[in-house]
């Protein structure tokens, strides 16, 4: 399945997540290192190790990865910790697509500062409402230019 599409399809996160079970059934590579603990004090290092494991396994294929780790970190620790991990990943990106599905309550409870930082770490942001997908556009605006126009 992975070779036909050209993408190395993978995921990482807790095995308790029902979506991970579905991805496993679809033969997506599970890059999670066991034991998995989103509350670990060395979570930054752990996430780096997971990304290295995935990159090594993918070889030269572009990666299509669903990362549930950052969602778990935002939920169990803080959104700011998840943003810090995303920022670190962005310093040394792998080729391909990385999907980071967050829970809306985790975003809304974090505050606008952390939410904006999270959005700045992503190329695109989507919100799912029922069966509809909305794309958010976030741009930094100059207050002076807005007033002058």
What spans do the regions from the language model cover?
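Non-catalytic regulatory/interaction regions at protein termini and inter-domain linkers
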Residues: 1-149
